[in-house]
Amino acid sequence: MNRALQCPPWGSRSRTPATSQFSGSNRSQQWPSSRLIAAEKANTANSVSGPDYALSTANIYFASQPGQSLYGLVTLAPLNPNAAFGDPTTFGTDNDPMVGKAIGGIVVFGGGLALYSGKGQILGGLGVSGDTSCTDHVIAWKLRHELKLDAVPMGPSPEHNDNMILDIRNGVSPSGFGHPTCKGGQPAEPIIRTLSRRFPTGPKS
């Protein structure tokens, strides 16, 4: 079993969260910070993906490091405090203060994916937080597939989609879009390597 503690918000193409949800019986079972991290992951994946090419938040980990092509990205879209904070009893509900507001924020580790219709139209982003970033990526991938919002047109992975690329060795990512392996918890890396085969992306008939 591979699971995350925090269920995902997903946002529209206008970068406003459409919903915020938590897993478990109550919000106290979640990491409090995961609510915002998940929303920022959705915002990031939506912001860096387009109609012809998708980048997951995992794909931009190495690219955002000093000396790489996206260095400085994390400073470009600060978190919107008016959307992030409010009555904590509404967090993870339809009345969450972030719903319908531009949340902002950029996250450059796994758990955020762009959403595409069956015809390949980009619709927004999905973010999951609450476990290792590798497990968050797996949960987001499986959920996107279940929702049938994974008609990814192209991406940087060897399978030509936005799957996590685990190619960082000695601080270097040959692809330029690598993500480190994750420590702690149930290892997700073997699952990640089979996601494209078990839960394929691409245009749907």
Name each region found by the language model.
Residues 1-205:
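Flexible, solvent-exposed loop/hinge segments and secondary-structure transition points
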